[in-house]
């Protein structure tokens, strides 16, 4: 499975567009993390707890999108994008989406 942010895959042409695929996850903040992050925000620097949480969320959303493409029989997902939104005061959604396609080798 090829996953790319570009419209094309080098050496291949899009033979069939299967449709938009997406994967998402919603993550809630942890009270312990909030306290630690609050203290760090006073002195500056990276909020490592949130960085790790968002990295995990990005991976989960990415994998769910890839699985949705596999379920359609796709060879690739092109134009992959990520979006985030706050769903409530203490939670955020991370969405990965793109276009599932069948590829044909260029001659």
UniProtKB/Swiss-Prot annotation:
<comment type="similarity">
    <text>Belongs to the UPF0145 family.</text>
</comment>
<protein>
    <recommendedName>
        <fullName>UPF0145 protein Memar_1285</fullName>
    </recommendedName>
</protein>
<dbReference type="InterPro" id="IPR002765">
    <property type="entry name" value="UPF0145_YbjQ-like"/>
</dbReference>
<dbReference type="Pfam" id="PF01906">
    <property type="entry name" value="YbjQ_1"/>
</dbReference>
<dbReference type="InterPro" id="IPR035439">
    <property type="entry name" value="UPF0145_dom_sf"/>
</dbReference>
């Amino acid at each position: 499975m090829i996953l790319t942010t570009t419209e094309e895959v080098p050496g291949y042409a899009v033979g069939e567009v299967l449709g938009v695929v997406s994967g998402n996850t919603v993550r809630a903040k942890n009270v312990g993390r909030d306290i630690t992050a609050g203290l760090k925000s006073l002195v500056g620097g990276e909020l490592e707890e949130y960085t790790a949480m968002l990295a995990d969320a990005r991976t989960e959303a990415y994998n769910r999108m890839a699985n949705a493409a596999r379920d359609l029989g796709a060879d690739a997902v092109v134009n992959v994008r990520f979006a985030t939104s706050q769903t409530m005061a203490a939670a955020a959604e991370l969405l990965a989406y793109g276009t599932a396609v069948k590829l044909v080798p260029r001659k």
